[in-house]
Every structure is written in structure tokens, then in C-alpha cells.
């Protein structure tokens, strides 16, 4: 069985509490490096999870790490630029949402992935939620006609999350 070498770009709270712990459960994947513009944060995450390599520079990370697949969990503001660098380096990419700031930027990422013959994927957002799947089924079966507008509010049902964080929010 092939073991995929994973690189994580962005070592904030979501990486620490969701992505990295979940990746550790996947038998055919191993995180080989992490990268964050905050070098101390990258080092802390690497030490916490026993990851051998950490970087504070995306270009060095892409040139030196053995990552075949990169998970872009970087800040929303810089994510498009990070994603373009990952794709241009010929690495497969899984990006946190939103993967691009606008349609034009998304199109550039898609076209670059095609030229480099790599897979570009992004977080599924809400499409796998049961209520969304049911709505898709009902629309597909013609049960509710042809929708012209869909409005949805989603909450997590608890206290405001960010004020209770106990890790670096970057």
C-alpha cells in the first residue's frame, strides 16, 4: 500500500485541532512536514505531533520537503497565493475553504492544476450535510419545482467559538 507524504501549510487552530489529528488516523498517509509563516508556531506543531520537518518559508518548504500532497490551511487572505505556489511546484493540493477569493482566481488555480497534472480539491463546505443532500435529492426529483433562490443559515448551537480558543488563532 502506498503511503502518501503530506505537507501541511498553515499551523493555526484548525490545523492543530482538526486536520492534523484526523490525518494521523489515515493509514496510507503520513505528515512529513509543516509550514507556517510563524516559525515558532510551525516548530510547536511539529514537536507536538512528532513531525520531522518544519518551515517558515513556503518556497523552502516546497523545494525541500518530500510532500506529495499539500494541505493548504493558511490564512484566507494569503491562501490563493499559497495554493498557486503549491500547484506550480507540481504538488497535489487539498485546500481549506475558500480556496480562492473570486471566480477568476479559482479559474487560475484550476487551469494551473491541469497544466501541472495534479489534483486540486477543496473542503466540501456544506455539500455533505444531510439536509443539503436531501434538498439536492428533492430538487433533482422535481419535488419542489425549480428554485430561484436558496437562503440558508447555519449555526453550531453553542457559545461564540473564538472567544474560548486556547490556541494561536493565526
Where are these regions (language model features)?
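N-terminal Rossmann-like dinucleotide-binding module
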Residues: 1-49
Amino acid at each position: 500500500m502506498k503511503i502518501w507524504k503530506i505537507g501541511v501549510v498553515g499551523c493555526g487552530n484548525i490545523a492543530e485541532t482538526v486536520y492534523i489529528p484526523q490525518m494521523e488516523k489515515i493509514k496510507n498517509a503520513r505528515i512529513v512536514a509543516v509550514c507556517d509563516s510563524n516559525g515558532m508556531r510551525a516548530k510547536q506543531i511539529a514537536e507536538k505531533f512528532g513531525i520531522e520537518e518544519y518551515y517558515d518559508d513556503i518556497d523552502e518548504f516546497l523545494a525541500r520537503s518530500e510532500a506529495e500532497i499539500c494541505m493548504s490551511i493558511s490564512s484566507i487572505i494569503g491562501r490563493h497565493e499559497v495554493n498557486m505556489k503549491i500547484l506550480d511546484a507540481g504538488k497535489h493540493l487539498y485546500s481549506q475553504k475558500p480556496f480562492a477569493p473570486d471566480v477568476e482566481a479559482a479559474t487560475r488555480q484550476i487551469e494551473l492544476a491541469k497544466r501541472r497534472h495534479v489534483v486540486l480539491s477543496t473542503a466540501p463546505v456544506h455539500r455533505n450535510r444531510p439536509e443539503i443532500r436531501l434538498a439536492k435529492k428533492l430538487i433533482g426529483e422535481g419535488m419542489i419545482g425549480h428554485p430561484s433562490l436558496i437562503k440558508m443559515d447555519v449555526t453550531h448551537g453553542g457559545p461564540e467559538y473564538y472567544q474560548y480558543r486556547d490556541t494561536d488563532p493565526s
